[in-house]
């Protein structure tokens, strides 16, 4: 019975990165051997056990064979006669197919260390093409390690292209897809994730609404990058640079979907794209069963981001409607995330990355002015129901008129 540290823990140690999760593989053991030593079984598809003291996962060495469509269409075989090399060959990338024994000796049958040094993401074997989830995983690793100079090997990108064209991506469940997408969006360079999916043809299968943005022009005066797809990648990049949460990053990715529906005869203008894009945002949200907070912010940013950019020009009544749409009185954080997404949209333009965004503080001040209006004096007057609501709205409007008057240039 030999125990090896495998996968990400080995990869990240060699990269000089912090090691968070450690996976172990056990060679030459059976389920009975593990139980005798006090390991607790937790695996449903294949034998995985928790260490009796550390609770870390230990999996029996196994092989796998394609038996159906999708990432779940595999038959696994785990037994004491499965070798370490057989276990490692089923893994996705060479940099994830290395193992280390208790003395730190490296087992690297597929040249993972060489690819690590060359900064290449390369598949281990042709069996890579049997699992469509690996398209998303490789794109996610590309997003994680782009800052270290990693790129996807051309032959691996070609396999990803073949997988995308095969239709197998449609077999991925919403939950598994969203898990990979959400993790990728929180990497250091999430725009690389979208770019790689675009390059291998997977984006048109997974999110055709986003794919449709590439090649769609915008007015050069406002968007020197011109291409809407390139703009969205830049907005997403800015959201990562500024360390924004998943809600903001998801909204940044989807905010301009309406531009993909603009007739070519109307290019490069995109009148009412905020409204036309809402059904597309909703469709993407539903496709991946996106968490409610991400869904809500994406729809609100899609609908109102132009209001955000024109905040200083808005009439007090329009500003009040905007604040009401976000329920800033009970959900101030959601409005703050809206402001963040708008600012990233403004910065996600070539040459505008460092441009100030005075709209942000103006919107925060407007929200504060509206929130500080007290309902108590109105209650003391005996107002209630619709009468109370109308009076409170009127007081907030007065507060915003005063606020705007104090900010006239």
From Swiss-Prot:
Q: Does the keyword Transmembrane apply?
A: no
Q: Name the coenzymes or cofactors required.
A: Mg(2+); Ni(2+)
Query: Its catalytic activity?
Result: a tRNA precursor + 2 CTP + ATP = a tRNA with a 3' CCA end + 3 diphosphate; a tRNA with a 3' CCA end + 2 CTP + ATP = a tRNA with a 3' CCACCA end + 3 diphosphate
> Per the database record, which ranges form the HD domain?
228-329
User: What GO molecular-function term can you cite, just one?
Assistant: ATP binding
Q: How is the cofactor bound?
A: Magnesium is required for nucleotidyltransferase activity.
Q: What does the UniProt keyword field contain?
A: ATP-binding, Hydrolase, Magnesium, Metal-binding, Multifunctional enzyme, Nickel, Nucleotide-binding, Nucleotidyltransferase, RNA repair, RNA-binding, Transferase, tRNA processing
Q: What Pfam family does this protein match (any one)?
A: PolyA_pol_RNAbd
Task: List, alphabetically, the Gene3D superfamilies matched.
Answer: Beta Polymerase, domain 2, cca-adding enzyme, domain 2
Q: Which PROSITE patterns match?
A: HD
**Which domain of life does the protein's organism represent?**
Bacteria
The record lists CTP as bound by: 8, 11, 91, 137, 140
Which residues are noted in the entry as Mg(2+)-binding? 21, 23
Query: What does the record list as GO biological process?
Result: RNA repair; tRNA 3'-terminal CCA addition
In the UniProt record, does the keyword rRNA-binding occur? Answer: no
Q: What does this protein do?
A: Catalyzes the addition and repair of the essential 3'-terminal CCA sequence in tRNAs without using a nucleic acid template. Adds these three nucleotides in the order of C, C, and A to the tRNA nucleotide-73, using CTP and ATP as substrates and producing inorganic pyrophosphate. tRNA 3'-terminal CCA addition is required both for tRNA processing and repair. Also involved in tRNA surveillance by mediating tandem CCA addition to generate a CCACCA at the 3' terminus of unstable tRNAs. While stable tRNAs receive only 3'-terminal CCA, unstable tRNAs are marked with CCACCA and rapidly degraded.
Q: Which family does it belong to?
A: Belongs to the tRNA nucleotidyltransferase/poly(A) polymerase family. Bacterial CCA-adding enzyme type 1 subfamily.
Q: State the PANTHER family in the record.
A: MULTIFUNCTIONAL CCA PROTEIN
Q: Which HAMAP family does the record match to this protein?
A: CCA_bact_type1, CCA_bact_type2
**Which protein are we looking at?**
Multifunctional CCA protein
Q: What is the native source organism of this protein?
A: Pseudomonas syringae pv. tomato (strain ATCC BAA-871 / DC3000)
């Amino acid at each position: 019975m030999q125990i090896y540290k495998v996968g990400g823990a080995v990869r990240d140690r060699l990269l000089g990165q912090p090691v968070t999760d450690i996976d172990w593989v056990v060679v030459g053991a059976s389920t009975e051997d593990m139980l005798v030593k006090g390991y607790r079984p937790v695996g449903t598809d294949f034998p995985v056990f928790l260490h009796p003291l550390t609770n870390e996962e230990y999996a029996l060495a196994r092989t796998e064979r394609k038996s159906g469509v999708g990432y779940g269409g595999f038959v696994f075989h785990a037994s004491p006669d499965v070798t370490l090399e057989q276990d490692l060959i089923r893994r996705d990338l060479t940099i994830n197919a290395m193992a280390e024994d208790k003395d730190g000796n490296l087992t690297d049958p597929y040249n993972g260390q060489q690819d690590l040094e060359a900064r290449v993401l390369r598949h281990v074997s042709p069996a890579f093409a049997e699992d469509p989830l690996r398209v998303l995983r490789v794109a996610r690793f590309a997003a994680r390690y782009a800052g270290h100079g990693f790129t996807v090997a051309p032959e691996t990108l070609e396999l990803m292209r073949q997988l995308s064209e095969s239709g197998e991506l449609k077999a991925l469940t919403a939950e598994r897809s969203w898990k990979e997408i959400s993790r990728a969006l929180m990497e250091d360079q999430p725009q690389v994730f979208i770019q790689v999916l675009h390059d291998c043809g997977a984006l048109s299968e997974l999110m055709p609404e986003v794919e449709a943005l590439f090649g769609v022009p915008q007015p050069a005066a406002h968007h020197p990058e011109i291409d809407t797809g390139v703009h969205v990648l830049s907005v997403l990049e800015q959201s990562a640079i500024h360390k924004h949460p998943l809600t903001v990053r998801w909204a940044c990715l989807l905010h301009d979907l309406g531009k993909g529906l603009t007739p070519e005869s109307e290019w490069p203008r995109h009148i009412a794209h905020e409204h036309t894009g809402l059904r597309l945002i909703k469709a993407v949200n539903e496709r991946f069963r996106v968490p409610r907070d991400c869904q809500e912010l994406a729809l609100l940013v899609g609908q109102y981001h132009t209001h955000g950019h024109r905040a200083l020009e808005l009439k007090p009544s329009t500003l009040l409607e905007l604040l009401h749409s976000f329920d800033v009185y009970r959900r101030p954080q959601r409005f703050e995330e809206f402001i963040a997404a708008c600012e990233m949209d403004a910065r996600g333009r070539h040459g505008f990355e460092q441009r100030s965004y005075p709209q942000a503080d103006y919107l925060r001040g407007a929200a504060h002015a509206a929130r500080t209006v007290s309902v108590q004096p109105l209650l003391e007057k005996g107002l209630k129901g619709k009468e109370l609501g109308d009076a409170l709205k009127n007081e907030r409007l007065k507060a915003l008129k005063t606020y705007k008057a104090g900010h006239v240039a």
